[in-house]
């Protein structure tokens, strides 16, 4: 919810979200002339600020009548998973048409640190676009990974985290909210 930043603001450090709220632009009533359809279409709308007719994402898969084949939004046989041989990771943003906020930020401010972390690759890649660091959970290994499109190796901090097997430990724990819902 939009008001969650205000509601939970005292729990955040002075950097991060609180810095964005203090120094950034804050829209309290913004909307797009668009009806939510599927997750990849909605994520592309959020990450590009454009509607599907502009950003070109219609689903996570579609049929290309010209090429007479099914196309995946993120699957890309030219790429591989980094530090994992199970096949998951053959992904890239090559089928994304529009520039994302991350792409624009990288173009305007090349020294920016841009990272997207998600549970699965579709969300991570669609939100990031072509720029920055992109990581997702490789569920078969309970490890974080990325695509060779973004990096040839995992940064040391992620490799170290994966080596410690903390994800398996978290996977079996029951999640409970630290704060009350209301």
What is each residue range found by the language model?
Residues 2-6, 39, 124-128:
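Extracytoplasmic/secreted cell-surface and envelope-processing proteins
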Residues 50-51, 56-182:
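His/Asp/Glu-rich, glycine-adjacent segments
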Residues 2, 14-17, 40-44, 59, ...:
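Extracytoplasmic/secreted envelope proteins and their assembly/folding machinery
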Residues 2-8, 32, 86-92:
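Second-shell loop/turn segments in exported
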Residues 27-45, 116-125:
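Short, solvent-exposed turn/loop segments enriched in Gly/Ser/Thr/Pro and often Arg
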Residues 1-24:
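Active-site-proximal N-terminal segment of extracellular/periplasmic enzymes that hydrolyze or transfer
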């Amino acid at each position: 919810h939009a008001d969650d930043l205000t509601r939970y603001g005292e729990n955040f450090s002075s950097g991060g979200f609180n810095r964005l709220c203090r120094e950034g632009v804050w829209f309290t009533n913004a909307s797009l002339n668009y009806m939510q359809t599927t997750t990849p279409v909605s994520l592309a709308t959020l990450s590009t600020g454009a509607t599907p007719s502009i950003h070109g994402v219609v689903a996570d898969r579609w049929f290309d009548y010209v090429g007479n084949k099914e196309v995946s939004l993120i699957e890309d046989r030219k790429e591989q998973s980094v530090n994992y041989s199970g096949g998951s990771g053959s992904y890239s943003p090559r089928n994304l048409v529009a520039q994302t906020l991350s792409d624009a930020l990288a173009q305007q401010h090349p020294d920016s640190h841009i990272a997207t972390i998600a549970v699965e690759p579709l969300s991570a890649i669609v939100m990031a676009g072509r720029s920055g660091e992109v990581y997702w959970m490789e569920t078969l290994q309970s490890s974080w990974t990325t695509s060779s499109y973004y990096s040839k190796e995992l940064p040391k901090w992620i490799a170290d985290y994966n080596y410690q097997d903390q994800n398996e430990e978290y996977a079996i724990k029951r999640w409970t909210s630290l704060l009350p819902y209301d």
